[in-house]
């Protein structure tokens, strides 16, 4: 029986993780559930799962949760705050930690799981985007096991030799005959829209992803293709890929989730229904496979598969992320922070859709002009850089409104 802590239990990844647990009750049990502020959803989860621990990142939300569940889940200990998140991520009795807290907020608890030597099911791409080499070094130092949950990275993982799968962040692709990794993305809801019309895109339109069911932040990131940019950075670290080994391709149908191209001309692709339960189930059961509750892909219903080059005029955020990836850790940390602030402002109608890229570019320019890569070589310096980038982004947004 594998015991789990689920960080981000009330989000879409958390829901899919619990779906896999429900499908395989003899294999998995839930020890701790953690979320941000959504007390209502957490109450429902505590009622159903009766976890040993329920944690809210927001301490006021933890107080509210305690008053709601003391009768329906009397044996659940309610905790609040970042330290509590780190505590349940590193519990001795826990085998695997689903790291699915969205954004920079997930870095510290994910790192706590790494330092406790856990099997870390990494859905929080921002942890790698923000901390890069520090994260990879910590995985090796503390003997943690890293498994990628993002559908694209999970697809790539499945197409790689076992020697690479068990040596993430340290592998040599060239030694294993791998010429390139092809990271696919749907292009989001605006891939065929007139670029001139993107200025007037509303939050409701941006979060309506054509293929995947996701939370609002990642849905907006998919619309700008910043999500693919962050995934590009994550792939660089996970697979130790050089710039000429990593490519982005738009694949509107989201049937092929990513591909690996080998030196001999072979291309291995992982395909399936666009359901996050599939990659989640693999990371939970690796190297075995379990029932994820996902219907099999019906090839007779797939129709055509199309592939396009990304248009950087349509997706400036993607270009920013790729360039930042090779500027240094300070650049990717700053870009991630700026983007979180800009997307939040857009979702709250304080910023236009195309302004997201403008804010990101301005913050990136200010940080890279004043900060050197060597200034981002510790967790403390990265968190300070994250804070500084958010402050700059907020100031720019205030000036524009």
From Swiss-Prot:
Residues reported in the UniProt entry to bind Mn(2+): 150, 152, 231
Organism: Vibrio parahaemolyticus serotype O3:K6 (strain RIMD 2210633)
Protein name listed in UniProt: 1-deoxy-D-xylulose 5-phosphate reductoisomerase
Homology family: Belongs to the DXR family.
Residues that coordinate or bind 1-deoxy-D-xylulose 5-phosphate: 125, 151-152, 186, 209, 222, 227-228, 231
Primary enzyme class: oxidoreductase
Lineage: Bacteria, Pseudomonadati, Pseudomonadota, Gammaproteobacteria, Vibrionales
GO annotation, biological process: isopentenyl diphosphate biosynthetic process, methylerythritol 4-phosphate pathway involved in terpenoid biosynthetic process
Keywords: Isoprene biosynthesis, Manganese, Metal-binding, NADP, Oxidoreductase
Catalytic activity field: 2-C-methyl-D-erythritol 4-phosphate + NADP(+) = 1-deoxy-D-xylulose 5-phosphate + NADPH + H(+)
Involved pathway(s): Isoprenoid biosynthesis; isopentenyl diphosphate biosynthesis via DXP pathway; isopentenyl diphosphate from 1-deoxy-D-xylulose 5-phosphate: step 1/6
One MF term in the entry's GO annotations: 1-deoxy-D-xylulose-5-phosphate reductoisomerase activity
Gene name of the encoded protein: dxr
Biological role stated in the UniProt entry: Catalyzes the NADPH-dependent rearrangement and reduction of 1-deoxy-D-xylulose-5-phosphate (DXP) to 2-C-methyl-D-erythritol 4-phosphate (MEP).
Residues engaged in binding NADPH: 10-13, 36, 38, 124, 126, 215
Cofactor(s) this protein requires: Mg(2+); Mn(2+)
Keyword NADP belongs to the record: yes
EC number: 1.1.1.267
């Amino acid at each position: 029986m594998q015991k789990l802590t689920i960080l981000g239990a009330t989000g879409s990844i958390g829901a899919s993780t619990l779906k896999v647990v429900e499908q395989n009750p003899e294999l998995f049990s839930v020890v701790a559930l953690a979320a941000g502020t959504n007390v209502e959803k957490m109450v429902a989860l505590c009622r159903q799962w009766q976890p040993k621990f329920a944690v809210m990142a927001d301490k006021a939300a933890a107080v509210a949760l305690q008053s709601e569940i003391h009768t329906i889940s009397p044996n659940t200990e309610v905790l609040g705050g970042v330290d509590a998140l780190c505590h349940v991520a590193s519990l001795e009795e826990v085998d695997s930690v689903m790291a699915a807290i969205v954004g920079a907020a997930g870095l510290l608890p994910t790192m706590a799981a790494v330092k406790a030597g856990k099997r870390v099911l990494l859905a929080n791409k921002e942890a790698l985007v923000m901390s890069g080499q520090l994260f990879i070094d910590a995985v090796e130092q503390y003997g943690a096991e890293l498994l990628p949950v993002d559908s694209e990275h999970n697809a790539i993982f499945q197409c790689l030799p076992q020697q690479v799968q068990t040596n993430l962040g340290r592998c040599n692709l060239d030694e294993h005959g791998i010429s390139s990794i092809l990271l696919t993305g749907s292009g989001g809801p605006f891939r065929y829209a007139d670029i001139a019309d993107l200025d007037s895109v509303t939050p409701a339109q941006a979060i309506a992803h054509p293929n995947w069911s996701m939370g609002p932040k990642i849905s907006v990131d998919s619309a700008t293709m910043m999500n693919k940019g962050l995934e590009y950075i994550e792939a660089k670290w996970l697979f130790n890929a050089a710039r000429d080994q990593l490519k982005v391709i738009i694949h509107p149908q989201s049937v092929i989730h990513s591909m690996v191209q080998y030196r001999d001309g072979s291309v291995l692709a992982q395909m399936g229904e666009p359901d996050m339960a599939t990659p989640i189930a693999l990371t939970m059961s690796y190297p075995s496979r379990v029932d994820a509750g996902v219907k099999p892909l019906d090839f007779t219903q797939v129709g055509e598969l199309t592939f396009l080059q990304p248009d950087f005029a349509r997706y400036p955020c993607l270009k920013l992320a790729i360039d930042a990836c090779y500027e240094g850790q300070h650049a990717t940390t700053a870009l991630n922070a700026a983007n979180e602030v800009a997307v939040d402002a857009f979702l709250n109608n304080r910023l236009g859709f195309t302004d997201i890229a403008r804010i990101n570019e301005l913050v990136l320019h200010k940080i890279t002009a004043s900060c050197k890569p060597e200034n981002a070589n510790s967790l403390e310096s990265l968190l300070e850089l994250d804070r500084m980038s958010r402050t700059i982004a907020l100031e720019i947004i205030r000036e524009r409104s």
